[in-house]
Amino acid sequence: MEKKNILITGRKNVGKSILVKRVIEQFHGYAGFKTVPLKNYGLISTYQMYDFINKTSIPISKYVDNKIVGIPESFSTFGKKCLKNALDSNYSLVIMDELGRFERTSRDFLYYVNEVLNSDKIVIAVIKAEKIDYLEKIKNRKDCYLYDLDEVSFVKAYQEIIFRLNVLLTWEGDKID
């Protein structure tokens, strides 16, 4: 099986999303989503999902009883649509930043995560460093390169990812600036 997807993992605040941001700055266009902080509650934050195609966002977590909990409906509706739009788009590159615990009960969303990974699209996905069944299955896929920023330097990961994408996207007819 040919490797074409790129997974990035590592402990909290190690630079996973910054790495993705630096990599995609080199591209003309891409589909998918990123997760961004919405509201800060001391040491913890709620989050929203931002759709790169439609340039819209929706909350994916909320603060309840002194803890942050996911909003499964956000993944089953907005998240699912975001990934479906990515599949239907002309973009060769799809970003999923990040996959974690909030969406683990959203079967519709997880179905489309797998559809995107199984598609001809090239995926860059940030994977939360937690032992969650669906995340472990993704990390063990044979069609993925896995970069653990706890084990490889940011610079080395960046250089290798850019190199791999140059090769992969040349096959697709796209190019990096």
Residue ranges and their predicted role:
Residues 66-115:
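Phosphate-binding/switch loop-helix module in NTP-utilizing enzymes
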Residues 21-68:
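N-terminal phosphate/diphosphate-binding loop that engages ATP/GTP or pyrophosphate donors
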Residues 30, 92-93, 121, 144:
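Conserved acidic residues
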Residues 8:
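Hydrophobic anchor at the beta1->P-loop junction of P-loop NTPases
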Residues 16:
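Conserved lysine of the Walker
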Residues 1-3:
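Phosphate-binding P-loop
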